[in-house]
C-alpha cells in the first residue's frame, strides 16, 4: 500500500520509549478491520508485524502513527497516551515504501526537512544532518537530488530523514518492498546495523517478507483477519510456533497428523504417535488427545542421527531436487508428504530409496489443529 505521507516529524526526545496498545480496535464505516488488540513493544525493541494482505498489520502501524482514528482502546508511547494526539505530537518518525522524497530538494535538504519544521537552530540542523547521513552511509551524496540516486540510496535518505529528528519511535511500513532482491538484502543488513548504532530506538516494522522479520526483529507478531494470532521472541516463535498458521507463514514447515500420548520425564517433551512411529516432541499445550498436529521444519531433518535421543521416521523418497548448496527431498512418511532440505549430500539418494529421517525432540512441535 503506497502512502504519500513520508514522516511524522517528532519533537526532539531524550531516552527511550516503548509502545503499548491496549485493546486497540479500528473500524471503517462500521466494518471492523482490527479486532481488539493488546500488545507491548519494549523500549529499544524491534517488533516486526507480518501477515498476508488485509490482515491488519498496516492498520496497526497507521493507528500508532495517528493517521487512523481508533474505534476503541488506547495507544501509549512511553508514559503518554497519544490515542487522540495529532501525528506531529507523538514523538515518532515514519518511513514508507515509496520513499516520498522531495524531488526538488537535495539529499541534505530532504534530511533537514523535519528539523526545519521544528524550527531547530541552523547549527543543530547541520550537525544532525551530517550525523544521519553518516549513519546510513550517504555522506558523499549530500548535494545530489533524488533522481540521481538508486532505489536503495533513496530509501537510505528516507531513513536518514526519519532518524535526524531523533524520534522516540521509528515506524517502517514495508520500506523495502519496492526494491529488487539484492538491494533489499543489502538494506536489511543496513537497517540491522542502524539499530546496533541506535539501540535506544524503538522500531515497529511492518512487512510481508518473513526473511526481513526473522533477520531484524527481536520479536514478531503475526496477523490474520484483523487479529494478532501469534506473538513472541523471534527464535522462539520460529522454532516453537503456537499454531498451524504461524508455523506455515513464518518459514516452511511439515505439518503431520499426530496423537499426544502423554508427558515424559523431560519437562516440555511429550510422547507422540506420528508418522507410523512413537516419537518425542516439544509441547506448549495439552499432553493427551487426538486431533493434534506435529510441526517439523524441513532443515531440521537429517539422514543421520544427531544424538542418542534422535527421533526417526521411516520414509520412501519421492523426488530429489538439487539446487547448488542445497538438496530438496520429498518423502512419503506413512502416507503423508514430508519435505527436507539438506546440505552437502553425496551421493544423492535415488527416487524409491528407503530412508531414515532423523530429528531432535526439541525440533518437533506439537500444535493444535
Swiss-Prot record:
Principal subcellular localization: membrane
Family that this chain belongs to: Belongs to the ABC transporter superfamily. 2-aminoethylphosphonate importer (TC 3.A.1.11.5) family.
Any single GO CC term annotated in Swiss-Prot or TrEMBL for this entry: ATP-binding cassette (ABC) transporter complex
One of the Pfam families matching this protein, by short name: TOBE_2
Membrane topology type: Peripheral membrane protein
Xref: PANTHER family: SPERMIDINE/PUTRESCINE IMPORT ATP-BINDING PROTEIN POTA (PTHR42781), SPERMIDINE_PUTRESCINE IMPORT ATP-BINDING PROTEIN POTA (PTHR42781:SF4)
InterPro entries xref list: AAA+_ATPase (IPR003593), ABC_SmlMolc_Importer (IPR050093), ABC_transporter-like_ATP-bd (IPR003439), ABC_transporter-like_CS (IPR017871), AminoethylPonate_ABC_PhnT (IPR017662), Mo/tungstate-bd_C_term_dom (IPR008995), P-loop_NTPase (IPR027417), Transp-assoc_OB_typ2 (IPR013611)
Compartment annotation: Cell inner membrane
Name of the protein in question: Putative 2-aminoethylphosphonate import ATP-binding protein PhnT
Gene source species: Salmonella typhi
Gene this protein is translated from: phnT
GO MF terms, alphabetically ordered: ATP binding; ATP hydrolysis activity; transmembrane transporter activity
Entry binding sites for ATP: 51-58
Gene3D superfamilies per record: 2.40.50.100, P-loop containing nucleotide triphosphate hydrolases
Biological role: Probably part of the PhnSTUV complex (TC 3.A.1.11.5) involved in 2-aminoethylphosphonate import. Probably responsible for energy coupling to the transport system.
Ranges where the ABC transporter domain occurs: 19-250
Keyword entries, A-Z: ATP-binding, Cell inner membrane, Cell membrane, Membrane, Nucleotide-binding, Transport
Domain of life: Bacteria
Amino acid at each position: 500500500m503506497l502512502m504519500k505521507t513520508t514522516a511524522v516529524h517528532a519533537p526532539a526526545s531524550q531516552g527511550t520509549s516503548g509502545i503499548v496498545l491496549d485493546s486497540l480496535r479500528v473500524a471503517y464505516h462500521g466494518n471492523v478491520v482490527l479486532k481488539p488488540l493488546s500488545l507491548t513493544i519494549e523500549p529499544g525493541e524491534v517488533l516486526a508485524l507480518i501477515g498476508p494482505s488485509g490482515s491488519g498489520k498496516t492498520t496497526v502501524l497507521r493507528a500508532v502513527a495517528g493517521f487512523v482514528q481508533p474505534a476503541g482502546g488506547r495507544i501509549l508511547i512511553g508514559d503518554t497516551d497519544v490515542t487522540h494526539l495529532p501525528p506531529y505530537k507523538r514523538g515518532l518518525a515514519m518511513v514508507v515504501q515509496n520513499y516520498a522524497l522531495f524531488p526538488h530538494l537535495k539529499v541534505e535538504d530532504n534530511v533537514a526537512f523535519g528539523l526545519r519544521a521544528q524550527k531547530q537552530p541552523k547549527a543543530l540542523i547541520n550537525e544532525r544532518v551530517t550525523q544521519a547521513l553518516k549513519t546510513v552511509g550517504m555522506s558523499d551524496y549530500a548535494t545530489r537530488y533524488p533522481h540521481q540516486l538508486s532505489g536503495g540510496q533513496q530509501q537510505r535518505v528516507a531513513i536518514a530523514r526519519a532518524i535526524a529528528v531523533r524520534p522516540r519511535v521509528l515506524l517502517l511500513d514495508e520500506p523495502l518492498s519496492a526494491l529488487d532482491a539484492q538491494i533489499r538484502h543489502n538494506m536489511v543488513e543496513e537497517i540491522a546495523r542502524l539499530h546496533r548504532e541506535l539501540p535506544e530506538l524503538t522500531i515497529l516494522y511492518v512487512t510481508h517478507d518473513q526473511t526481513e522479520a526473522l533477520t531484524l526483529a527481536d520479536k514478531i507478531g503475526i496477523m490474520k483477519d484483523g487479529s494478532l494470532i501469534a506473538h513472541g521472541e523471534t527464535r522462539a516463535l520460529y522454532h516453537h510456533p503456537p499454531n498451524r498458521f504461524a508455523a506455515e507463514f513464518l518459514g516452511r514447515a511439515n505439518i503431520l497428523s499426530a496423537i499426544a500420548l502423554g508427558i515424559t520425564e523431560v519437562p516440555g517433551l511429550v510422547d507422540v504417535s506420528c508418522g507410523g512411529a512413537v516419537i518425542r516432541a516439544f509441547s506448549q499445550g495439552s499432553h493427551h488427545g487426538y486431533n493434534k498436529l506435529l510441526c517439523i521444519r524441513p532443515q531440521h531433518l537429517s539422514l543421520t542421527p544427531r544424538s542418542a535421543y534422535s527421533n526417526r521416521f521411516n520414509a520412501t523418497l519421492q523426488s530429489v531436487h538439487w539446487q547448488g548448496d542445497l538438496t530438496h527431498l520429498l518423502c512419503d512418511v506413512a502416507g503423508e508428504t514430508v519435505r527436507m532440505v539438506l546440505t552437502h549430500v553425496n551421493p544423492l539418494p535415488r527416487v524409491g530409496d528407503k530412508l531414515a529421517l532423523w530429528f531432535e525432540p526439541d525440533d518437533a512441535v506439537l500444535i493444535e489443529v
